[in-house]
Design a protein with these regions (language model features):
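Structured-RNA-binding interfaces characteristic of tRNA pseudouridine synthases
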Residues: 2-193
């Protein structure tokens, strides 16, 4: 997803171990990548390891600059609301996404995907003029977090009601899809067994 950031990301590839140590390979990769990408660790895994399917959970964080607070240095890494947001409504609606729900209204579907997924936890926090919305689960659909945040922003702008979100999560109706901007989204953590 273009402009989405990752603080944690796993990549699987094969190489001839006898030619390079893990430390040498890490050094070479870090010199090859742009400064925005940095290899922090190399771990040997089974040949059939899949970074996408073998994880036990992923945590996404969406950054929003609080209304009335603009930090230009973070403008490419966060969402800046263009109108008033009712923060209390966002706090109220965020826990609605926890649990097992039908998320087809919160995704761009690409074929025969399982849209009945579980969000293990959500959280809201504020720090230094920033709002942090976190979503933790084993699997997410394409653009799911951006559509969930879009629904929260729509609710915070009084464009939709709580029942609209609940009906969409129950698969009863298609929510008017509003996809949040990509630059506020971070893949914050991936956990493996």
């Amino acid at each position: 997803d273009r402009y989405v950031n990752a603080l944690s990301f796993a990549l699987a590839f094969s190489f001839k171990k006898e030619r390079k140590t893990k430390e040498d390979l890490q050094y070479v990769l870090n010199r090859m990548f742009s400064p925005e990408v940095y290899v922090t660790e190399i771990v040997e895994v089974a040949e059939d390891f899949s970074p996408r399917y073998d994880c036990t959970s992923k945590t996404y964080c969406y950054l929003i600059q609080k209304p009335g607070y603009v930090n230009p240095l973070l403008s490419s890494l966060s969402y800046i609301p263009d109108c008033h947001l009712d923060i209390e409504r966002i706090k109220e609606a965020l826990p609605l996404f926890q649990g097992t729900h039908e998320f087809s209204s919160f995704a761009t579907l690409e074929g025969e995907e399982n849209t009945l997924l579980t969000i293990d936890s959500t959280s809201y926090s504020e720090e230094e003029g920033m709002i942090y919305l976190r979503f933790k689960g084993k699997a997410f659909l394409r653009y799911q977090v951006r559509f969930m945040v879009g629904a929260l922003l729509s609710y915070g702008n009084h464009r939709i009601e709580k029942d609209d979100i609940l009906d969409a999560l129950a698969g009863k109706r298609e929510l008017i899809k509003v996809k949040a901007e990509p630059q506020g989204l971070f893949l914050e953590e991936i956990e493996y067994p």
